[in-house]
């Protein structure tokens, strides 16, 4: 739940590009085949219409009890035929690494930390991420 919520708020990519393979009607919009479409992952993952009024807040319980959302609402590793082939390995490795680190260390956010996510090619902390680390 914690990793899923982290990936929702801070996806590894800001957007994915896709080429429309056939003419599509999306609501009142006609999208011809060959059109390049950018799917803004970070904006969809922060959409209050999908995630609720607290969409900007870290809430791992969004994913509790196997709760899921519409396929197009959560896609930190992309979507469709070009989805990241390493997503399952990444999640397993992240869970193992996080468990090993949390068994040995405690973390606190530094008083000097300023939360300011910045969109470049990826989502990055504008002023760094000052963390106080203490061995357990």
Predicted segments, located by residue:
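Conserved cytochrome P450 K-helix E-x-x-R motif and the immediately C-terminal K′/meander segment
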Residues: 1-27
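Conserved cytochrome P450 K-helix/beta-meander segment immediately N-terminal to the heme-binding cysteine loop
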Residues: 39-67
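Active-site-adjacent bridging/hinge elements
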Residues: 66-75
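Cytochrome P450 heme-binding "Cys pocket" and the immediately downstream C-terminal segment
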Residues: 87-124
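C-terminal helix/juxtamembrane-tail motif
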Residues: 106, 124-136
């Amino acid at each position: 739940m914690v990793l899923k919520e982290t990936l929702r708020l801070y996806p590894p990519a800001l957007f994915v590009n896709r080429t429309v393979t056939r003419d599509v009607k999306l609501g009142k919009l006609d999208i011809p085949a060959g059109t390049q479409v950018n799917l803004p992952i970070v904006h969809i993952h922060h959409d209050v219409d999908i995630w609720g009024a607290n969409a900007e807040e870290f809430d791992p319980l969004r994913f509790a009890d196997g709760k899921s959302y519409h396929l197009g609402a959560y896609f930190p590793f992309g979507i469709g035929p070009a989805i990241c082939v390493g997503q399952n390995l990444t999640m397993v490795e992240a869970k193992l690494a996080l468990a090993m680190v949390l068994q040995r260390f405690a973390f606190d956010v530094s008083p000097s930390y300023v939360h300011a996510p910045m969109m470049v090619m990826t989502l990055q902390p504008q002023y760094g991420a000052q963390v106080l680390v203490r061995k357990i």
